[in-house]
From Swiss-Prot:
Function of the molecule: Globally modulates RNA abundance by binding to RNase E (Rne) and regulating its endonucleolytic activity. Can modulate Rne action in a substrate-dependent manner by altering the composition of the degradosome. Modulates RNA-binding and helicase activities of the degradosome.
Gene name per UniProt: rraA
BP GO annotations: regulation of RNA metabolic process
GO cellular component: cytoplasm
Family: Belongs to the RraA family.
Subcellular location: Cytoplasm
Name of the protein in its database record: Regulator of ribonuclease activity A
Upper lineage: Bacteria, Pseudomonadati, Pseudomonadota, Gammaproteobacteria, Pasteurellales
PANTHER family: 4-HYDROXY-4-METHYL-2-OXOGLUTARATE ALDOLASE 3-RELATED, REGULATOR OF RIBONUCLEASE ACTIVITY A
Entry superkingdom: Bacteria
Cytoplasm among keywords: yes
SUPFAM superfamilies: RraA-like
CDD domains documented for this protein: RraA_family
A GO molecular-function descriptor: enzyme binding
Keywords associated with the record: Cytoplasm
Length: 166
C-alpha cells in the first residue's frame, strides 16, 4: 500500500507526532508502516534476533540503541530474517551495516548511519517499553509510518483508504 508522510501530516497533523529528521532509508522498501514493537539495547543485537524470529506481519521493530553509531545493530542476516518473517520495517536509533545487501532485501529500514563493525550478540536489553528519541516518545502498540520524507507516529491507526487509489 502506498503512503506519503507529507500527505498524512496535512490530514492528521493534530493527531500525530513527527520524528526529527535524523534518519536515512537503507532497506529495499522506501515506505512502510505498522504497529510498533520496541526494544531498548546498547551495541548488542541478541534480543533483536529473538524478536525478529516472531511473525512480524503488520509490525515495525523500533530499536532504541541509544543513538550509538560505534557498532551496527542490524546487518543483512537480521534484515533477511525480518523480511522472511513478514516484518514491515525496522527503525534503528543507532547504526546498521552491509548496505549493499540491505538494498536488495524487501524490508524498510531507517537508521542513523552505517558502520562496518558488528555488535555483540548477547540477549541484553528490554522489550515492549516506552522509548524516547527524535523528539518523540514511542509506546509499544503505537503506529508508525515511514517514507523517504520522514517518520510519523500515531497512537491509533490512520485511515489510508484514500492512498489506495494513488
Amino acid at each position: 500500500m502506498y503512503i506519503d508522510t507529507a500527505e498524512l501530516c496535512d490530514i492528521y497533523l493534530d493527531q500525530i507526532d513527527v520524528v526529527e529528521p535524523i534518519f536515512s532509508s537503507f532497506g529495499g522498501k522506501s515506505t512502510f508502516f505498522g504497529k510498533i514493537t520496541t526494544i531498548k539495547c546498547f551495541e548488542n543485537n541478541g534480543l533483536i534476533s529473538e524478536i525478529l524470529e516472531e511473525n512480524g506481519e503488520g509490525r515495525v521493530l523500533l530499536i532504541d540503541g541509544g543513538g550509538a553509531v560505534r557498532r551496527a545493530l542490524i546487518d543483512a542476516n537480521l534484515a533477511q530474517l525480518a523480511a522472511d518473517n513478514g516484518w514491515e520495517g525496522i527503525i534503528v536509533y543507532g547504526a546498521i551495516r552491509q548496505l549493499q545487501q540491505l538494498e536488495n532485501i524487501n524490508i524498510g529500514i531507517q537508521a542513523l548511519a552505517p558502520i562496518p563493525v558488528g555488535s555483540d550478540e548477547q540477549s541484553i536489553g528490554e522489550t515492549d517499553v516506552p522509548v524516547n528519541f527524535g523528539g518523540v516518545t514511542f509506546f509499544p502498540d503505537d503506529y508508525i509510518y515511514a517514507d523517504l520524507t520522514g517518520i510519523i507516529l500515531s497512537q491509533e491507526p490512520l485511515d489510508l483508504e484514500e492512498f489506495d487509489s494513488l
